[in-house]
From Swiss-Prot:
Gene name per UniProt: yorI
Protein name per the record: SPbeta prophage-derived uncharacterized protein YorI
One of the protein's GO biological processes: DNA replication
The organism's taxonomic lineage, starting at the top: Bacteria, Bacillati, Bacillota, Bacilli, Bacillales
InterPro entries per record: DNA_heli_DnaB-like_N_sf, DNA_helicase_DnaB-like_C, DNA_helicase_N/primase_C, P-loop_NTPase
Gene Ontology, cellular component aspect: cytosol
Top-level taxonomic group: Bacteria
Length: 504
């Protein structure tokens, strides 16, 4: 079994001696997967849970008492003489050497991961070596290698394979100045600016929704991922929108073709959202039929607008990448769609089967989500479309939100690497108590309306504004947005130059 028993003893023993190691999650990322033995995994699980539940001293009594509630785990613990083992590793552990043994532990975890994916790990660590001198040489070389160096070695193998078998016409090489004047001319004729998002502030920050760009806007369950996408699509494609301030219908200068691909909501649910946005009448009133006569006229007019607009709704409940591509291709060819909203990046039974079959190995959910993100970016380029998608958030978001900590890719469900494939990425959350207190001086000036949502922008490739927070007031009933102001990560007011985009 690929493991370093000495490293495991030292890591577990050091945690027993100094449980605060577990609080340094930014420095030490230890999980049950780092321990291939079920016994060691159970022991770490118990120690970690006890610490995070407030236990300050970890010992055999606490751990034994905790595991008694879990019959299977408790049996494994006692079959391996867990109480004696705890006493032994506490005596052997040297906390001062924890960093060294932690790195050894993680390197072996990485090797098991690569081995499980089908990679040949013998050139990094060969357990089959018999000659003591060869073993010593290998161990010496292995000790010198960092995790990043091991990862780079495998990344280079993948690059070599891609170059050997690549047939895509997208891969080209040019001299640095080739076509540069034509490029400048194209910027003069048509600046690299897209069409508006539903938020004017986000439009300015991202330079609009641009073709061949992949944006990610993640949120919590029920946080409005689909609602925001429908609103964006209507902002671009509805022929008219009702202006409640002017109390009149206003012609929409944008007449783009868009499609919203939903994996959960039925077409009828997307339609009621669209009616609410176009008419500015709250959706719940439409669904409950509690609208007055004036609102009824607005909704009926919105229905006519929706019928005349180039907005297309698709429902893919159990999807795979091929089905997503077919749906996009159909809309591009048949409906001239250039703006795609896919709700949202998550695993399904079909996609698990498809990805595992193609790779030849059983992939984890985080690996599948990363591959999906990569594929979606590829579809943007292939079909020359803009794409917006989303993910759920992982279980750590709420604590960070409550504490007013920085919200970034670390809180994406599955893998923060999903954002690596995007051109812009953000997380939208309700205004927290910490943020409300922090912006109180800004609101007291009396120049800005009070927000109820914050969009945490943590990636914005090729643009001026990165790692900023956009405070907005969003009416979740009709998805009309009023931008309030923008701050840096310290909630200090910053000025974002408004980008005026004109149709045509």
């Amino acid at each position: 079994m690929l493991q370093d028993k000495q490293a495991i003893i030292q890591v577990l023993g050091s945690i027993l001696k100094d449980p605060t190691i577990l609080s340094e999650s930014n420095k030490y990322k230890i999980t049950s997967d780092d321990f291939p033995s079920r016994f060691h995994s159970i022991l770490f699980f118990a120690m970690s849970n006890l610490f995070h539940q407030g236990t300050e001293v970890l010992n055999d009594v606490e751990i034994d008492g905790y595991l008694k509630d879990y019959d299977i785990q408790y049996k494994i613990f006692h079959d391996n003489k867990g109480l004696e083992y705890i006493e032994k590793i506490q005596e052997l552990a040297v906390v001062e050497n924890f960093d060294y043994h932690y790195k050894r532990l993680k390197k072996f975890s990485l090797l098991r991961e690569m081995d499980g994916l089908g990679f040949d790990i013998k050139e990094i660590y060969d357990e089959s070596l018999i000659d003591p001198k060869e073993q010593e040489k290998m161990q010496e070389q292995f000790d010198k290698k960092s995790i990043d160096e091991i990862l780079t070695a495998y990344e280079m193998k993948i690059v070599d394979i891609k170059e050997k078998f690549r047939t895509s016409s997208e891969s080209v090489g040019i001299q640095g100045g080739e076509g540069i004047n034509e490029l400048l001319d194209s910027f003069e004729e048509s600046p690299d600016i897209g069409v508006p998002l539903n938020s004017e502030m986000l439009t300015s920050i991202f330079r609009g929704s641009r073709k061949k760009k992949f944006y990610l806007r993640s949120s919590i369950t029920g946080g409005g991922k689909t609602r925001n996408m429908v609103a964006d699509a209507c902002r671009l494609s509805a022929t008219e929108l009702y202006d409640p301030k002017k109390k009149e219908w206003v012609s929409n200068p944008w007449s783009e073709s868009s499609t919203v691909i939903s994996t959960e909501m039925m077409a009828e649910e997307l339609q009621s959202l669209a009616l609410a946005y176009i008419s500015s009448v709250e959706e719940k009133k439409i669904l409950r039929n509690t609208i007055n006569e004036k609102e009824k006229q607005l909704v009926r007019k919105a229905a006519k607008v929706l019928q005349e607009s180039n907005i297309w709704f698709e429902h893919l409940p159990d999807f795979n990448i091929q089905e997503i591509e077919r749906t996009i291709e159909k809309n591009v060819i048949k409906n001239n769609v250039e703006y795609v909203y896919f709700d949202y990046i998550h695993s399904s039974v079909t996609i698990f089967s498809e990805m595992s079959k193609k790779s030849g190995v059983n992939l984890r959910e985080d690996q599948i989500l990363l591959l999906m993100s990569d594929k979606l970016k590829g579809l943007c380029n292939k079909y020359d479309v803009y794409m917006m998608s989303a993910t759920q958030l992982n279980g750590d978001w709420k604590e960070a939100w409550l504490k007013g900590q920085v919200i970034d890719a670390s809180y994406l469900r599955g893998s923060k690497a999903i954002a690596d494939k995007t051109d812009a990425a953000m997380i939208i959350l309700p205004l927290s108590k910490k943020e409300k207190d922090a912006i109180d001086p800004i609101l007291k000036e009396g120049f800005y309306p009070e927000p109820n949502f914050v969009t945490h922008v943590f990636k914005n490739r090729g643009n001026e504004y990165d790692k900023v927070k956009v405070f907005s007031h969003i009416n979740m009933g009709n998805m009309r947005i009023k931008d309030c102001f923008t701050t840096n990560l310290d909630n200090e007011l910053i000025t974002v130059e408004k980008l005026n985009i004109k149709a045509g």
